[in-house]
From Swiss-Prot:
Name this protein carries in UniProt: Glutamate--tRNA ligase 1
Key word Cytoplasm present: yes
Source organism per UniProt: Helicobacter pylori (strain HPAG1)
Subcellular location: Cytoplasm
EC number(s) stated in the UniProt entry for this protein: 6.1.1.17
Keywords, in A-Z order: Aminoacyl-tRNA synthetase, ATP-binding, Cytoplasm, Ligase, Nucleotide-binding, Protein biosynthesis
């Protein structure tokens, strides 16, 4: 088997979004799974729209999710002389030509074609022009598209695709200022980089016949193509920023783990048996572009949150502390190692993101300022207050390093007073945490410690 070489080639006109990252992941997995090469190419030939910040954000996103590319990043803006050389080659071989049609003439032609209910297109009028070029017109360069031929390629996702060359006009490969067009620079770079397989969004499917014309004109080897359907929202519409089509780094800021995001995106448009959870190693072992789906996939926040919660639960306390560094939350320095482990173990089971985990740390470690009203109103204060006073005395005798002892102390009150567990547990929870839900009470007592627990109960009794 020949060496698999893939690439990801974004334009730095905006930040890397979720669909782009998925394309990068597919190309990365295919190359790495076959001990091949994976390159990053920045398609920055549109000098008026390029953004250095956007290019850097793409690189930053790659670093975050762990997509390592081979060699140096290739910037197309540094390769204009190479493209110029290949355009001249086509001109010299009479496979391309200068077109002197002005914009006004082209607009007028299109209006005439529309009036005749024809598809607007250039009419190839300068294809075999031998006369004197009109003055004052900076020409574009057009490729001579072979006529009366059928372009056939077998797309790895779409199947066999056929296009008659008569449906294509002689499209532009160099603008009047000499800069090359997208379709031209793509095929030159893919050929010179030795790209064997192109996995990209199916919005590029219509470009492929034109690119094949150029591959053939320059006698370049045509790569294999895989055109992946776009990602839709849960209503079946094009993904918007509100539904997930946002800067990849926003997901890091929201507290998603890179492992969860890669797993989630790899499964959007690709499947392997009924398996949902994949480590990077498992993805490398299982991924094959032949298994890419031909139908659009749907972005699901519920699914992403479920996956993220799974990966969150599998992090150790030390790993979580490292991951939590970008987020602000209560000081943890007063907790001993056992309390810290217990805090993170208890809360990671109840959190879907790192951001949510940070908020829950605050909720536990910050003494309640007020108490959940609907729970407080239901309390029988005449019964509750004596119970908490008695429990305070019991806590002074308990070893707070022993969760079982803390649990026994609570059950002792319930048994001695012959009351239902909720009659005591609910007010105790309110006193410690300020609300009716949250982590277990023995965990809360253990994490808070004797001094803080007694302080919170005393404050509640005075409220």
């Amino acid at each position: 088997m020949s060496l698999i070489v893939t690439r990801f080639a974004p334009s730095p006109t905006g930040y890397l979004h979720i669909g782009g990252l998925r394309t990068a992941i597919f190309n990365y997995l295919f190359a790495r799974a076959n001990q091949g090469k994976f390159f990053l190419r920045i398609e920055d030939t549109d000098l008026s729209r390029n953004s250095i910040e956007a290019a850097n954000a793409i690189i930053e996103a790659f670093k975050w999710v762990g997509l390592e590319y081979d060699g140096e990043i290739l910037y197309q803006s540094k390769r204009f002389e190479i493209y110029k050389e290949y355009i001249q080659k086509l001109l010299d071989e009479d496979k391309a030509y200068y077109c002197y049609m002005s914009k006004d003439e082209l607009d007028a032609l299109r209006e005439e074609q529309k009036a005749r209910k024809e598809t607007p297109r250039y009419d190839n009028r300068y294809r075999d022009f031998k006369g004197t070029p009109p003055k004052g017109i900076e020409p574009v360069v057009r490729i001579k598209v072979p006529q009366n031929e059928v372009i056939v390629f077998n797309d790895g996702v779409k199947g066999e695709v056929k296009v008659n060359t008569n449906e294509l006009d002689d499209f532009i490969i160099a603008r009047s200022d000499g800069t090359p067009t997208y379709n031209f620079v793509v095929i030159v770079d893919d050929a010179l980089m030795g790209i064997t397989d192109v996995i990209r969004g199916d919005d590029h499917l219509s470009n492929t016949p034109k690119q094949i014309v150029l591959y053939k004109a320059l006698n370049f080897k045509i790569p294999n193509f895989f055109h992946v359907p776009m990602i839709l929202n849960e209503e079946g519409q094009k993904l918007s920023k509100r539904h997930g089509a946002t800067n990849v780094m926003d997901y890091q800021e929201r507290g998603y783990l890179k492992e969860a995001l890669v797993n989630f995106l790899a499964r959007l448009g690709w499947s392997y048996q009924d398996k949902e959870i994949f480590s990077m190693q498992e993805l490398l072992e299982c991924f094959d572009p032949k298994d890419l789906n031909s139908s659009p996939s749907c972005f699901s926040w519920h699914k992403l949150n479920w996956l993220n919660a799974h990966y969150l639960k599998n992090q150790s306390a030390q790993e979580l502390l490292e991951l939590l560094k970008p987020f602000s939350f209560s000081d943890l320095s007063h907790l001993n190692p056992a309390q810290l482990d217990r805090l993170l173990d208890a809360l990671k089971e109840r959190s879907q993101t790192l951001k949510e985990l940070a908020l829950k740390i605050d909720e536990v470690l910050t003494a309640p300022i007020e108490y959940e009203k609907k729970v407080f109103k239901k309390l029988n204060q005449a019964l509750v207050m004596p119970l908490l006073e008695k429990f305070k005395l019991e806590l002074n005798k308990v070893n707070f390093n022993d969760e079982n002892a803390l649990e026994n102390a609570m059950h002792k009150i319930i048994e001695e007073e012959k009351i239902k567990a909720g009659s005591f547990m609910q007010p105790l929870r309110l006193a410690l945490l300020g609300k009716g839900g949250g982590i277990g009470l023995k965990e809360a007592l253990f994490i808070l410690g004797k001094t803080e627990s007694l302080k919170r109960i005393e404050k509640f009794l005075k409220n």
